[in-house]
A protein has these predicted regions:
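Hydrophobic alpha-helical membrane segments
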Residues: 1-260
Length: 260
């Protein structure tokens, strides 16, 4: 059974949802995971592999930590495209059929121009954070050569360096907020209705602004579960990332409606 993609005639509009709605998204995401565990675990395994590569190649250099974290941020949403497609297939099948992994692997082709522009814009945002991070480290250490990762960990959490920690995490939080706001429902929207990148990002920001507390809870859930995945030496990501992606599809369905 092929999944069709509708050309939108209506404009996407954000709507208000219940404050604790993210808990329902998470529940639905786990339910979807149980319906197609093998397909979801394939994507989860890729996230785990990315985590190990990040650790392997960035153990002794902060530049590489940031670089590979950037790659993770850029590649992550595009891996999620396949999981969004799996969620969409489940909706289309309505329990009568099996999702196709091969279909999900090529889902990005349905709206290639929009996804390409999205990747470019996200790359600009993440590269901006990359440059700001290097600048802050350089100013903090006041040296031409960047410190080792061990030096950063040891010195950054020294009480004497509290000003650096506050500034670093404040700037990082700002960048994270921007990326979250423009992406929380934009990729599912671009996949589902084939809208352009700017329209999808605007709808995503509107969804966040209309549901500040709700989206704050959703962001906290994402961060908390991702942290669990990292502290389990990335093994937890094999389940956590697919569940979060599938849950994000349900978030999109709840947060976005269409009007003429």
């Amino acid at each position: 059974m092929d999944v069709t993609h509708d050309i939108p005639r209506d404009r996407p509009v954000a709507r208000k949802v219940e404050t604790l709605r993210p808990l329902q998204w998470l529940k639905k995401g786990f339910r979807d995971f149980q319906k197609a565990p093998a397909d979801c675990l394939f994507y989860g395994a890729v996230f785990v592999l990315m985590g190990y590569l990040l650790t392997l190649y960035s153990e002794h250099s902060p530049e590489l930590v940031i670089t590979f974290a950037t790659i993770f941020l850029l590649a992550g949403p595009f891996l999620a495209i396949g999981l969004y497609d799996i969620a969409k297939q489940m909706e289309a099948f309505d329990g009568h059929g099996r999702v196709k992994l091969a279909h999900s692997l090529s889902a990005w082709r349905v709206n290639l121009p929009a996804f390409t522009l999205y990747a470019a814009l996200l790359a600009v945002l993440v590269f901006g954070w990359f440059r700001v991070s290097l600048l802050m480290f350089a100013l903090f250490y006041d040296t031409a050569a960047l410190p080792s990762l061990n030096d950063i960990v040891v010195n950054a959490f020294n009480p004497d360096n509290i000003a650096f920690l506050v500034a670093y995490f404040a700037v990082g939080f700002l960048f994270a907020q921007v990326v979250f706001s423009v992406s929380v429902v934009s990729i599912p929207l671009m996949l589902d209705k084939e809208v352009d990148t700017v329209t999808a990002m605007i709808a995503s920001v509107q969804a966040v602004l209309k549901n500040l507390l709700t989206m704050g809870i959703w962001a906290a859930i994402i961060v908390a579960l991702s942290a669990v995945g990292f502290v389990t030496y990335f093994l937890g990501l094999i389940i956590i990332m697919p569940v979060l992606a599938l849950a994000s599809w349900h978030a999109y369905r709840d947060l976005i409606t269409f009007e003429r």
